[in-house]
Amino acid sequence: MCAASKSENTQLGQRPPTRRQQRREKRRNVRRIHLTLYKTEGQSFHILFREKIMAGLAGYVEDGRLSAEGIECACAGLLTFRGILQTLAIDRISVFATASLRNISNTEQALSVIHAATGYFVEVISGEEEALFGYAGAMQELRLSGAFLDIGGASTEIVKFDGGTPVNFASFPIGSLSLYRRCVKKILPGEGSLKRLRQEISQTIDLSEDAIVLHPLLIGVGGTARAALKLAQHYCKISDDCHSITVEQLDALCTFLCSGKKAASDLILRLEAERIHTLVPGMLILQHVFHLFGAQQLVISKYGVREGYLWPCKTAWT
């Protein structure tokens, strides 16, 4: 779930006060509730701090419904962040949710309970909006042509763009955590689980021939892409100043992580312990899309859907 906010004395479409303004945005995916505090001035912004709560909400989805306990868990996280925002006197707040509330059957019930408990109206953005917001966020840092990829816990967004302009986009109901829950029996996938993972990915992320155009460059955002870079920097001896991965490095890393060797699990535990169960499924999605577009290089952006959600709102206020 995510959020951004506006001053109480400023209406959408009007020019905001000239003083520096603080904005906060919160996002919850299947596992986490995120808080990000921004400071904006004119057409620029920078992140003051980020915070997250490990909510474990995926464990509360039963038969496609988020249980009462899961909704209560979400409310508790939001109330924790509301206390922080009240202490800091932040007056511009918006909350939005992605696949976490989009892909359940009782979305309206969850939204109603969350509003009653927290006072927040949560905007559930569509898969297409999530794809375009993620792309817009990445474009705040990068001005490139190629394909954009955001692997979340429950969905994967792909945007093809040219010269900073999106050409087309798609959202797929498959993510690192949902894939893990569907295909993996233990913490790390064995040979049978790897076969199920690859089959599920190829069947779900299946673009038409007309939609597939070879792109040498792939831009990645989100936790899976950042974790891939972090592990590649260690395993492939990439400089910490480098924010890209080649197809050869990605394939070598995937082969190592899927090898079943203790050194592979040790590497994940040392660098990305909280992703011990979801990293391999996410990496296999990344590898599939990489080869689908014939990409030669992955560039990781520090901005994503939250900054993309922030940007159009901020533009409307100026």
Please provide the spans of the model-predicted regions.
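Helical "lid/coupling" subdomains associated with nucleotide-phosphate turnover
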Residues: 37, 58-88, 100-145, 160-163, ...
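Gly/Thr-rich phosphate-binding beta-strand-loop-beta motif of the actin/hexokinase/Hsp70
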Residues: 11-45, 138-172, 223-227
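N-terminal glycine/serine-rich phosphate-binding loop of ATP-dependent small-molecule kinases
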Residues: 1-23, 31-97, 111-117
